[in-house]
């Protein structure tokens, strides 16, 4: 595993919600970070079929364009009753005809697909959020960090916090959805803690332990 010997990195994302969450997580570590969106980097086409492949595409593009290490996230909602969908195509389910993303529409698509499968009981609506962070260097070296959190898809959507599919995902052991939690509650982790809640915080915890700590 390669250690990160700089605190200047690029957050390889154009997703405002994702950029904000990563900024919250890296903030305490003294990073100087700009996003690919702020640097006006074009969005690379995500042609991978796994979270790891798509995360690497984004991180490597930003690392090579900037000459700096770049941290990306590829994440998605994996629903058992839908054979793992939307999975790596989670963002695609939200795409509209004009190229924007409508997650209210995407959540309705999820519910409609579950209804078609007759998945109305909680035990038939099990799912997990997956996050794969990729740290890439300009020389092409990459490190991956995967985090997952198990839960249930609920309906109707609950809460207005977070972003994406957060309002319909209730993590196991909790009565509230990610959409009803503050950012601190959703991540459930700060440096030194043994436990993290969200998929992204779990992946980030591995990143810290692997690349930042001595």
Curated annotation (Swiss-Prot):
GO terms for MF: dITP diphosphatase activity; ITP diphosphatase activity; metal ion binding; nucleotide binding; ribonucleoside triphosphate phosphatase activity; XTP diphosphatase activity
Cofactor note: Binds 1 Mg(2+) ion per subunit.
UniProt enzyme class: hydrolase
Reaction(s) the record says it catalyses: XTP + H2O = XMP + diphosphate + H(+); dITP + H2O = dIMP + diphosphate + H(+); ITP + H2O = IMP + diphosphate + H(+)
E.C. designation(s): 3.6.1.66
GO annotation, biological process: nucleotide metabolic process; purine nucleoside triphosphate catabolic process
Family annotation (Pfam families): Ham1p_like
Assigned GO CC terms: cytosol
Keyword Hydrolase found: yes
Active site: 74
Cofactor list: Mg(2+)
Keyword field contains Isomerase: no
HAMAP family assigned to the protein according to its UniProt record, in alphabetical order: Non_canon_purine_NTPase
Record-stated family: Belongs to the HAM1 NTPase family.
Subunit structure: Homodimer.
This protein's name: dITP/XTP pyrophosphatase
Species of origin: Agrobacterium fabrum (strain C58 / ATCC 33970)
